């Protein structure tokens, strides 16, 4: 297969998926233990992540730094229609100037400000998918 054909085929697949967002629902968890099984699954070979999104690292960071700074867990897990996890956002919630703000766990110490992704979803995610994710999260806030 030539490179142009491979790119064209991949683009066609992505466009077919983009007519409707693939993130059907989100869970927002306030407890790391409740997120651990999905989180560790997204650390597997089918996922895209960095060492800075690993459960063990961020659990330790939250216990030492996050807790001292008054941060609460705000773990977002996005699921497809079969309840298969597509992504996990390891976020922390804080109060700032009267507003609730979320940011990636790790703060200024260790983070690339990114989610853990199912590899296939990450490779083909569209703006429709991400806009849908933001809409679903906003319904929980």
What does each model-identified segment do?
Residues 1-141:
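N-acyltransferase acceptor-side catalytic subdomain
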